[in-house]
């Protein structure tokens, strides 16, 4: 079997396709959560604690300046506000995944429905057994 046909067989397996769909949906979900955190959740929280824009929160370790030659030196900044936004995004995504896994586990633990009656094979075996009993009763000399 050639390399291309083996790869095609591998790529068309259900697990690989499911994984690809999951990655695409996950990327889209990440963008939705980012917008939710940055545009809907954090602004009211920032407003409630004094009109704080979390994305601009930072510690300035060294302010921007100009050296002796007139060259601009950028500031050294730790942007912890973006980190806070990212942590909130992570918590939301982790909670959503937790809920999905919990739902999947609950669905997979459901007990299968009890069979509604004997299977076709069991019915056939019973018929054969009964027929053999009748034959034995009618003709007891047959071993």
Curated annotation (Swiss-Prot):
GO terms for molecular function: mechanosensitive monoatomic ion channel activity. The keyword Ion transport applies. The chain crosses the membrane at residues 16-36, 84-104. GO terms for cellular component: plasma membrane. It is found in: Cell inner membrane. Its main location: membrane. It holds the Pfam family MscL. It comes from the Bacteria. The keyword Transmembrane applies. It is a multi-pass membrane protein. Keywords: Cell inner membrane, Cell membrane, Ion channel, Ion transport, Membrane, Transmembrane, Transmembrane helix, Transport. Channel that opens in response to stretch forces in the membrane lipid bilayer. May participate in the regulation of osmotic pressure changes within the cell. Homopentamer. Belongs to the MscL family. PANTHER family: LARGE-CONDUCTANCE MECHANOSENSITIVE CHANNEL, MECHANOSENSITIVE CHANNEL MSCL. This is Large-conductance mechanosensitive channel. It comes from Xanthomonas campestris pv. campestris (strain B100). The lineage of its organism: Bacteria, Pseudomonadati, Pseudomonadota, Gammaproteobacteria, Lysobacterales.
């Amino acid at each position: 079997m050639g390399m291309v046909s083996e790869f095609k067989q591998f790529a068309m397996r259900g697990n690989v396709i499911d994984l690809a769909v999951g990655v695409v949906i996950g990327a889209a979900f990440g963008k939705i959560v980012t917008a939710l955190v940055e545009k809907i959740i954090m602004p009211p929280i920032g407003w409630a604690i004094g009109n704080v824009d979390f994305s601009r929160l930072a510690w300035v370790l060294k302010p921007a300046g100009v050296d002796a030659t007139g060259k601009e030196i950028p500031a050294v900044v730790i942007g912890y506000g973006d980190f806070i936004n990212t942590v909130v995004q992570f918590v939301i995504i982790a909670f959503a995944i937790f809920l999905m896994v919990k739902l999947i586990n609950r669905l997979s633990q459901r007990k299968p429905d009890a069979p509604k009656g004997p299977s076709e094979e069991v019915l056939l075996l019973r018929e054969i057994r009964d027929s053999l009993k009748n034959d034995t009763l009618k003709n007891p000399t047959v071993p």
